[in-house]
Amino acid sequence: MTDTQVFVALLLALVPAVLAYRLGTELYR
């Protein structure tokens, strides 16, 4: 795996996590 592939994989894993976190904070309020 190249550095670019690792970066893309991390980005793809991070985006849904951030969205889920923001949704969770909105529902918590």
From Swiss-Prot:
Record bears the keyword Protease: no
Cellular location(s): Cellular thylakoid membrane
GO BP terms: photosynthesis
Topological category with respect to the lipid bilayer: Single-pass membrane protein
One Pfam entry name: PsaM
The keyword DNA-binding appears for this protein: no
Keywords for this protein: Membrane, Photosynthesis, Photosystem I, Thylakoid, Transmembrane, Transmembrane helix
InterPro entries given in the database record: PSI_PsaM (IPR010010), PSI_PsaM_sf (IPR037279)
Source taxon at top rank: Bacteria
Cellular compartments per GO CC: photosystem I; plasma membrane-derived thylakoid membrane
Disulphide bridges: none
UniProt main location, coarse: membrane
Coiled coil (residue ranges): none
TM regions (residue ranges): 7-24
Family according to the record: Belongs to the PsaM family.
UniProt name for this protein: Photosystem I reaction center subunit XII
Organism: Synechococcus sp. (strain ATCC 27144 / PCC 6301 / SAUG 1402/1) (Anacystis nidulans)
